[in-house]
Amino acid sequence: MGIKIYRPKTSSLRYKTTLSFDELSKGNDPLKSLTKGKVSRAGRDSSGRISVRRRGGGHKRRYREIDFARRDKFGIPARVAAIEYDPNRSPNIALLVYRDGDKRYIIAPKGVKVGDILESGPNAPIKIGNALPLENIPVGKMVHNIELNIGKGGQLVRGAGGYAMIIASDGDYVTVKLPSGEMRMIFKKCIATLGEVGNEDYMNVSIGKAGKSRWLGRRPKVRGVAMNPIDHPHGGGEGKTSGGRHPVSPWGQPAKGYKTRKKNKYSDKFIVKRRNN
């Protein structure tokens, strides 16, 4: 999917770029039975207090229900009926129509086109877009949408352009290299989808103007040094001051290089090599 640039008829268009959406199917509304309403919480928790700052507004969205597991369709071929836009995530989604008539959305892998036949299960061919247990995928193949727990559905590597690589297989576990550089052991019966996640040009898009951030539901970010002392540890001072201390969050936690992972987390035993910091 290419990048569209604009003639600078206004100052805000000078740096704005968008995706061209050439790969999307024309004239396709989302399947109503696979969508549901999504209420914007504007960063508030159940008591109405702000739990995530700088959220609110934005365009109304409907949630597309994605089949991250594909376990109940083992051995049933499916045809890719459409490639659609999803406002709730960075990759596009593919509408699958199974031979038994059922319809599901999945994350659209790179290279999958309308009319392709996809399958899931341990006996599925080694082909981009097919979902297989990790033990059935050859070493060196790229995968995405990787399960961590059997039956829970894919949790790892779901963002646009992402992929992991099968490094080794030993006993009950398969070693996978994740996009962060972390090498992790995952149980061999967990499902993964072959290939890369599509829409790889997403990372090259320039928002270009403040208004587009508002369309996406992102509100302005105020610097700590521009606040009062009551609002932030960096606040206050006469004139423009630099904060006077090492960078911290509004609650005093160091913001640069501070390790936040628990020292004795249960999943440490599955991590062969920590991520690249």
UniProtKB/Swiss-Prot annotation:
Assigned keywords, A-Z: Ribonucleoprotein, Ribosomal protein, RNA-binding, rRNA-binding
- Which portions of the sequence form the region Disordered? 32-58, 225-277
Give GO terms for biological process. cytoplasmic translation
What GO terms fall under cellular component here?
large ribosomal subunit
- The answer to whether the entry has keyword Cytoplasm is no
Q: Which SMART domains match?
A: Ribosomal_L2 (SM01383), Ribosomal_L2_C (SM01382)
Identify a single GO molecular function assigned to this protein.
Answer: structural constituent of ribosome
Gene3D superfamilies, per database record:
2.30.30.30, Nucleic acid-binding proteins, Ribosomal protein L2, domain 3
Q: Which Pfam families match?
A: Ribosomal_L2 (PF00181), Ribosomal_L2_C (PF03947)
SUPFAM superfamilies in the cross-refs: Nucleic acid-binding proteins, Translation proteins SH3-like domain
> So what does this one do?
One of the primary rRNA binding proteins. Required for association of the 30S and 50S subunits to form the 70S ribosome, for tRNA binding and peptide bond formation. It has been suggested to have peptidyltransferase activity; this is somewhat controversial. Makes several contacts with the 16S rRNA in the 70S ribosome.
The family classification in the record reads: Belongs to the universal ribosomal protein uL2 family.
List the protein's name.
Large ribosomal subunit protein uL2
Q: Which organism is it from?
A: Borrelia recurrentis (strain A1)
